Amino acid sequence: MKRIWKNRAKNIIMGITAVTTLVIFSMNSHAETAKLDNQKEQEEVYSLQFNENNYTLQTLSKGDHVVKYRAYENIVYVSNPVDVDYQIMNFYVPEAYYEGKNIANYSIQTAPIFFPNQIGGYNPAKPATIENESVYLALAQGYVVAAPGARGRTTKNGEGINTGKAPAAIVDLKAAVRYLRHNDEIMPGNAEKIIANGTSAGGALTALLGATGNNKDYEPYLSNLGAANEYDDIFAVSSYCPITNLDNADIAYEWLFNGVNSYKWRENGTLTEDQIKISQELKTMFPSYLNSLELKVPQNIHSEILKEYTALLLDVNGNGTFKEYIKYLLLSSAQRAFDKGEDLSSLTWITIKDKKITDIDLNKFVNYATRMKTPPAFDSLDAKSFENNLFGTETIDNQHFTNFSKNNSTVEGSLAEALPIKMMNPMNYIEAKGTTISQHWRIRHGSIDRDTSLAIPVMLATKLANNQYNVDFAIPWNIGHEGNYDLEELFQWINEISAN
C-alpha cells in the first residue's frame, strides 16, 4: 500500500528486521536496560513489524448488523514492554476491504482508524474486543478499529514494583499510535486519520493524547519502552466526561458545588464543619486560575449577554461572565431536550415562555444535580483517592498532587513531582511549542454528571476553540457520568471530518 506523505518524512524504513530493531533500541535505552537488570531478568524484545498473516477470520451478527472481519489480536506495540497483559492492541478490519470492495466512501487505504480505549478510574485496561458495541458498530461503518490496552495506577510487576503510575497510561497510548504510523504502509486504514475515543479517565486520556502530539516531555518514556520512532499526534478526539485537569479539579468542583452540603454517592451524607470550611477555601482559589486562562466566548454563540470574544472571567466571589457562560450552555442543553419532546414542566427552576427556555436558576440546578464528592474531591487529604494513587511512584502507592492538600494533609503524604502532574493535564500543552494538537474535537459532558465540575470540560473546550481548533462541545441533558450513548451522532461526526 502506497501513501503520499505531506510535510513529513518517514523516520524509519519499513521492513527492518527484529535484529536491527534490537540494536537501535539497545543503543538508545540504557536507562531501561539498567531497570531490566535490576529486575533480574531480561524481557523478550518484540518486533515492531506488523504481521499481516497473523489473524483469524470471524463473523459477528448483532441486530441488523452482520460484520465479517479479520481479527489481529494481542499485538504488542512496543519492542520492550513492561507488561504484555496491557501493552497490547486489538486490530479489526472489515473483510470486505480484502475483497476489493468499498464501504460507504472508504477503501482499505482511506478508512479512518477508530481508536477506543476502555480505561476507567485510571485503572489498567485491556484492549476492547469485537463484543464492545462501539467496536462492531465502527466496523459496520467501514472504519478500521485499533483498540489499545494500557497500564494503569494499580499495575505492578513480579517484584511488586508499581509500573503504571502517571504518566504510564498516556505513554502507552502514544506508543500504540506510533506502532500504527510505523506500519501504515502495510496495515489497512489511514494512520493520518486516527480518531481516539474514551470515557471518564479514558476520555481524559484521549484529550491528553490529542493535546500532546509529539511533545518532547514524553520522549524518554517512549524510548525506554522501545516505541517506534514515529510521530504520535492524532487526527481527532472524542472525549466523554473527561476526568482531567486534575491539579485544578478540586477548586473547580467547589466553585460549582460550594453551598451544597449533602452528598450522594456510595453513601449519603452531610459535609462536616471542617469540610464546609475546606469547600469555601477551595472555591475562593478558582477565579484566579480561571482568569489566568484568558478564555473568551467562542464564535457562533448566540446570547443577549455574551457576545463573541467576550472575556470569560470571575470575580473574587466566583461570579462573572464565565458563570453566565456555564448557564448559557445549560440553557441550550435544556432547549435541545425540550425541542425533542422532553417534559421539563416539573423543574420549577427552569423558565419556559412560548416554547423557549428563557432562564435557569443555576444554584437550584446544582442542588438538583446534587454533590457527589466531599472536599477535596480529587486530592484527598488522607491521600486515598484514585487520583492520589495515580500519582504514586514505583515504590510509593499514593501521593498528593496539589499544594493545598499537601499542606492540609491528615497523613504523612508526599507531593508528586511536578513533571508527571504536568504531563497528565492537557491544558498545559494546548499552546505549547513543539506540540501538534488534534484539529478536530468532540467533547460531551452530561448535565447531571457530578464526577467532576462542569467547568472542567468547558475550560478545555473553550481553550481549544480559542486557539482555532474545530470543537464540537455539548452538554447532553439529564445524562450522568457515561459515554458512547450517542454513537450514531459520533459516527456521523467522524464521517464528516474524515471526508475532508
Locate the predicted segments by residue.
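A domain-start/cap signature at the N-terminus of enzymes
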Residues: 32-103
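Alpha/beta-hydrolase active-site loop
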Residues: 163-186
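Short beta-strand element of the alpha/beta-hydrolase
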Residues: 89, 103-120
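Primarily recognizes the serine-hydrolase "nucleophile elbow" in alpha/beta-hydrolase
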Residues: 182-260, 421
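Non-catalytic, alpha-helical, charged scaffold/linker segments
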Residues: 240-244, 248-370
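Cap/lid segment of the alpha/beta-hydrolase catalytic domain
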Residues: 116-171, 210-212, 479
